[in-house]
Amino acid sequence: EENESEIIQNSLDFSDTKVKEIFTPREKMFTINLKNLSLDKLVEIICSTSYSRIPVYYDNPNKIVGILLVKNFLADYLDDKTVKTDLNDSIEKPFIVSPNVTIDELVDGFQKQRKQIALVYRNNVLLGMVTMEDVLEELVGTISEKSEIVPQTGKEKKK
């Protein structure tokens, strides 16, 4: 019951909470510079992470050109490992928001744009990014990754 009331209270706070309170700063973002990057090297970088969507740029990390949809790119790449794999087919246009947008407005934007990541810009300067996961964590608390979850068996080991 305590968790339920906390979630309800957090959802009511969404109209007051702003993106600037929950976004990931640019310095902590994982991004990829596509300039002069071979497809093989891109695959190597992607496989070293667990991200399904990665902001990408050419030369200037403040000018994100889009969000690489990893699953789409890898499917195309594995289907045709040649230069014919068009990277642009796997990059979606970024959804851009102001740091002063409320969480309510952000969620509405995520739904309308059919996106899960928004880039946070102020005066054409990239401040960071905010994800649907950030919003959910604000609502229900920290979300554990699958690898962080330890199954509970209910049985204790006997010594």
Predicted regions and their residues:
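Cytosolic regulatory modules rich in charged/polar residues
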Residues: 1-159
